[in-house]
Amino acid sequence: MIFIDACLKKKTPYTPVWMMRQAGRYLPEYMKVRNEVGGFLELCKNYKKASEVTIQPVEILGVDAAILFSDILVIPLEMGMDLHFIKGEGPIFESPVKNENDLAKLSLQKAVKNLQYVYDTISLTREKLPKDKALIGFCGAPWTIATYMIEGKGSKTYSVCKKLLYTNPEFLHKILTLITETLKLYLENQIKSGVNTVQIFDSWASALECEAFFEFSWKYIIEICDFIKAKYPQIPIIVFPKGISGYLDKIYGNFDVFGVDWSTPLESASKILSAKYTLQGNMEPCRLYNKNAIKESVEQILNTMKGKPHIFNLGHGILPDIPVENAKYFIRLVQERSSL
């Protein structure tokens, strides 16, 4: 698989490419399936339909890897929290974790068992996916998942979570430890079910100052990486801590690929990290609105990463109103230009 070869810093005939959120609302085929089942969570839990939308971008766009269709918040949902997705507001937890009693109600064992629909999605997808296409499993980072569990929803300031960090760090560490232990088993089950690699998304890493990031986020990400590598050394691990360009010189750990967001210059990230890790990224997602903007960025990024281990991706997820034709153009352009 060209994607796995790139993860492991092997030479590839061209630069493999995929997009975060590639199984999503910009695709009419995805919306048709989602509307058939009734909604986002219903689609996550319907393994046959979830498998179908996982494969769609491979068939429609020609990306080099499929990423499991699911959500990072199925973890707290299946631990016992009450999750709703509300249009215009996003995910909402009716009863956020506020104290030890709330935490005691959540079950690691229950979550790992209840997530069978994810494992079934993986098994079916791996069976149907072309043999040369990688299947990416994933989870949210403990810190990012914790922000939703504690805040009850998305936040601009994360003040509830950060208040806990500075006033009761021991309790926050307890929450993060429970999430981390659950994620270890969750990713292990994804690997057993057939994923070829896993990505850990830390979407809200940028909410933390440097010292707090390494204590309350990175430490737990690396604990998960160490667990996976000890048992499955052949499985590449991708980490994506968004918005931490100022901390790159302090990054360490037992992973293979470092995801670079669009706000981080790829050239500076490469100088610090390319000797040890494959870099993934990092075109600005809004460039997909215009083919000239796509072409300019693709050429610049390929030039920057020439001769260095690289997986092409966006610097964050594709947006719902991107024209499918532009997404196809992007994938094709990367594959063609990088093969010259």
From Swiss-Prot:
Keywords: Cytoplasm, Decarboxylase, Lyase, Porphyrin biosynthesis. GO terms for molecular function: uroporphyrinogen decarboxylase activity. It is found in: Cytoplasm. Pathway: Porphyrin-containing compound metabolism; protoporphyrin-IX biosynthesis; coproporphyrinogen-III from 5-aminolevulinate: step 4/4. It is an enzyme of class 4 (lyase). Its main location: cytoplasm. One of its GO terms (biological process) is protoporphyrinogen IX biosynthetic process from glutamate. Its EC number is 4.1.1.37. It catalyses: uroporphyrinogen III + 4 H(+) = coproporphyrinogen III + 4 CO2. Substrate binds at residues 21-25, 71, 148, 203, 316. The record marks 71 as: Transition state stabilizer. GO terms for cellular component: cytosol. It holds the Pfam family URO-D. Homodimer. Catalyzes the decarboxylation of four acetate groups of uroporphyrinogen-III to yield coproporphyrinogen-III. Belongs to the uroporphyrinogen decarboxylase family. This is Uroporphyrinogen decarboxylase. It comes from Campylobacter hominis (strain ATCC BAA-381 / DSM 21671 / CCUG 45161 / LMG 19568 / NCTC 13146 / CH001A). The lineage of its organism: Bacteria, Pseudomonadati, Campylobacterota, Epsilonproteobacteria, Campylobacterales.
